[in-house]
Design a protein with these regions (language model features):
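Amphipathic alpha-helical regulatory segments at dimerization interfaces
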Residues: 1-6, 11-23, 71, 75, ...
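GAF sensory/regulatory domain recognition
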Residues: 17-21, 29-64, 84-86, 160-187
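Flexible loop/coil segments at beta-strand boundaries within sensory signal-transduction domains
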Residues: 37-38, 108-113, 122, 126
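Signal-transducing coupling segments at domain and membrane junctions
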Residues: 50-58, 77, 82-101, 121, ...
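A short, aliphatic-rich beta-strand micro-motif
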Residues: 100-109
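Short alpha-helical interdomain "coupling" segment at the junction between an upstream regulatory sensor module
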Residues: 130, 144-163
Length: 187
């Protein structure tokens, strides 16, 4: 409920990573959003110390080419590494050295992958059917919340533009009216 009520992405995404990590006890939770060119999944929020370092340097992964997150961003299907040491797709991130298992879930809006929810644990084999199902439902809710926040921002921008145009039009009309008005009275 908290997630769907927040309207600003800059507040929403860090809130999500904190809540997910606290609720499930994950070592790291990150949210990546696919950029406009669909070339990179860009880290937008993270709760761990390593994640904060990655955020500071603008961490991004190439869609389809780098790690589990890149895989999920390209194919739009969940990916789980129960033991990252045995997963051929896993990207060994030096900022998250304690990761032993990882799950990445697509964030989708109308069948388009807009991002990835990435959760990591310090224990191997931690992911099971129950938390996969729960996190999949949560990923769907996160996707809706992200889309709502984006639509809210677009609506706010459109409203500001309309107000600016209205003020400009009103001012132009008033100036035109003032010039065209002839003086009435005694000479």
């Amino acid at each position: 409920k908290i997630i769907t009520s927040e309207q600003k992405l800059t507040t929403l995404l860090p809130l999500i990573t904190r809540l997910v990590s606290e609720s499930f006890g994950f070592y790291h939770t990150g949210i990546f959003l696919v950029n406009e060119t669909k070339q990179f999944a860009v880290l937008q929020a993270a709760n761990s110390e390593g994640g904060k370092i990655m955020l500071a340097r603008g961490h991004k992964l190439e869609v389809g080419a780098t790690g589990i997150v890149g895989y999920v961003a390209k194919f739009g299907t969940p990916r789980i590494a129960l033991d990252v040491g045995l997963d051929a797709v896993y990207f060994n991130n030096p900022d998250l050295p304690n990761t032993r298992s990882e799950m990445a879930l697509p964030l989708k809006v109308r069948d388009e992958t807009i991002g990835v929810l990435d959760v990591q644990s310090e224990r191997p084999g931690v992911f099971n059917d129950n938390n996969v199902k729960t996190l999949s439902i949560l990923a769907d809710q996160i996707s809706i919340a992200i889309e709502n926040a984006r639509l809210f921002t677009q609506t706010q921008q459109a409203l500001m533009e309309a107000q600016t145009l209205y003020r400009q039009n009103l001012q132009d009309s008033w100036l035109t009216f003032s010039r065209d008005e002839t003086s009435i009275g005694y000479q």
